[in-house]
Amino acid sequence: MFADQQSVQRAVYLALAKLARPSCAAIFEEFLLPDGRSAQSELDRRGMGPQEFVQSLLFVDGRRATACQDGGSVLITTPGSLLIRVCPGFAQVGSRLSATLVIHEALHALGLGENPPSSRDITDRVNRRCW
């Protein structure tokens, strides 16, 4: 167990509740993966829904990760990886943003890269769909 694990559990629970709404789950249709398919098509290929996929993510202590040490991120992953590193400070992020970031990282875990779309664009679009 790591320091922010309870905060992660709360964020995942709230993200799952939001993804139960079709309008929020539709975020996976909005983003295209590098091969041109939607994130939803990757979920379909895996035989999973958004909620089931979020539950498959593995959250681990990321305090030693270089990207966490710069202080600019609270969750990090590599596109296509189910491993999400939790940076110090995640517990200080509000519940709405923390759940949004879980969904944001789920999109990366399905293969979505960044720049483009920017990290802010991903987060803003998740916010619009899910809140």
List the predicted regions and their residue ranges.
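Predominantly extracellular/secreted Zn2+-dependent metalloproteases
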Residues: 1-99, 109-131
